[in-house]
Curated annotation (Swiss-Prot):
Family: Belongs to the PanB family.
Name the record gives this protein: 3-methyl-2-oxobutanoate hydroxymethyltransferase
Subunit structure as annotated in this protein's UniProt entry: Homodecamer; pentamer of dimers.
Residues given in the record as Mg(2+) binding sites: D43, D82, E112
Originating species: Sodalis glossinidius (strain morsitans)
Primary location group: cytoplasm
Cellular localisation: Cytoplasm
InterPro entries per UniProt: Pantoate_hydroxy_MeTrfase, Pyrv/PenolPyrv_kinase-like_dom, Pyrv_kinase-like_dom_sf
Residues of the active site: E179 (proton acceptor)
Keyword tags: Cytoplasm, Magnesium, Metal-binding, Pantothenate biosynthesis, Transferase
One Gene Ontology term from the biological process aspect of the record: pantothenate biosynthetic process
UniProt catalytic activity: 3-methyl-2-oxobutanoate + (6R)-5,10-methylene-5,6,7,8-tetrahydrofolate + H2O = 2-dehydropantoate + (6S)-5,6,7,8-tetrahydrofolate
Amino acid sequence: MTTISHLRKWKQQQRKFTSITAYDAAFARLFAEQGIKVMLVGDSLGMTMQGHDSTLPVTLEDMVYHTRCVRRGAPSCLLLADLPFMSYATPAQTFENAAALMRAGANMVKLEGGAWLADTVNGLTARAVPVCGHLGLTPQSVNIFGGYKIQGRDAVGADQLLADARTLEQAGAQLLVLECVPVALAERVTHELSIPVIGIGAGAVTDGQILVMQDALGITGDSAPSFAKDFLAAGGDIAAAVRRYVQEVETGQFPAAEHSFQ
């Protein structure tokens, strides 16, 4: 069973690790068999599985259902599950919803936001619910950002993101996802935090990498983000593509410069 202790050890050893989104038992089993030890049941399922144009319509019930499916397929992986949009607006709501995801099989819940979430993170941790933070491009805030844009490019934004990351760690977060930020900022955050940092569109400097499974397998086609790579394009079956993904992350080949933001 992969645990957060393994990820901490890998960070200390500077050993890169690979993660991916998963939404059903069949793909979760295949991913686990190819060596992926960390999976995320992301609210990205609203776009990849349900056909919405954002993650906002996803419900807690959706997340619970897919978390159960993935856990059945990959019983030994470290499994993260997103708390969906507006499911952590109050302390009571947050604790109840996080408990539902944990009962469904999650090892950790992920929520989007900065320092304003400190009390929430602290409260969850005190109640034995491990927390993964998510900074940078946070898709639930798409209407605030005015679209899916790179974050932290100016000095003010970069300093704020770093401060948010420190605050989340101090509040008890055990893991952090960093999305769509410049490589230099990702390097600062990864170096300054003692907790593992997983990047997506954040360069090869983070402790681990994650991709949406449809992007990694070329299913999204022309709509795939620039930081993604189609690992199925080189030929072979899905299992071979996943093995390439794992191998390229662990050897530092992915993400390359063309998959990163300067």
